[in-house]
C-alpha cells in the first residue's frame, strides 16, 4: 500500500468513525444532515479509490475519476465552510468540542482537500466541472425543503427540525429569504469550485509518463 493509499484509508476510517458516533449518539435521523451525507460520500468514495488503486494503479491516469473526486472534494469542502462560518458560532461549547464534531466538520473535510490538492494530478479539471459539482448540494437543498414542508421527518439536535439548518427554515424566514440564502451559498460554492480548478492548474502531481497499460505492454 502506497503512502497516498494509506492516507486515503485513514481519511475514510475517520469519516466512518465520525458518522458512526453521530448515528450511535443521535440516531439514524442524522443521515438527514448534509454534513453526515457528505462524510458518507467521502469515506465510501475513498474506500473505492483505495481498492481500485491496489488493483489498477494510481488514479492519476484516470481523468474521469479525478474530476469526480474534485466534485467529492467540493461536497465536503462546503460542509467545512458552512459549519465553520455559519453554524459553529451558534454551537454551545460542550457540543463544539467533541470528537465527532471535529471529525465530520474539520478533520475529514480538510484532509480530503489536502489529499486532492497534493496527491491528485494537476491540469485535469474542465471549465464546466464546478457547474456539475454543484448539482449534489442543489439536490440536497431540494430534498431538505421537501422534508421541511411535506415529509416532516424529524431531525435530531436542531430547533429548526424538520429543517436541518436555520438558514433554510422556510417556516421561520419565508421562501424569499431562504432562496436568497441558498443563492448566496451556491454562488460561493461555484466561486470556491473555480478557485480549486485554478489552484489545480498550478499544484499537484505531474502527468505520469507511463501508466498501467504501458507497463503491461510486452
Put a short name on every predicted segment.
Residues 156-195:
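Membrane-interface transmembrane-helix boundary segments in multi-pass integral membrane proteins
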Residues 138-166:
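Juxtamembrane non-transmembrane "cap" segments at the membrane-aqueous interface
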Residues 20-28, 83-94:
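Juxtamembrane "helix-exit" motif on the non-cytosolic side of transmembrane helices
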Residues 33-37, 41, 48-85:
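Hydrophobic/aromatic-rich structural module bridging two neighboring secondary-structure elements via a short loop
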Residues 14-22, 76-85, 136-146:
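Aromatic-anchored segments of alpha-helical transmembrane domains
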Residues 28-36, 64-65, 92-104, 128-129:
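Non-cytosolic membrane-interface motifs at loop->transmembrane helix junctions
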Residues 39-52, 107-119, 182-197:
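Hydrophobic cores of alpha-helical transmembrane segments in multi-pass inner/ER membrane proteins
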Residues 1-11:
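N-terminal membrane topogenic signal
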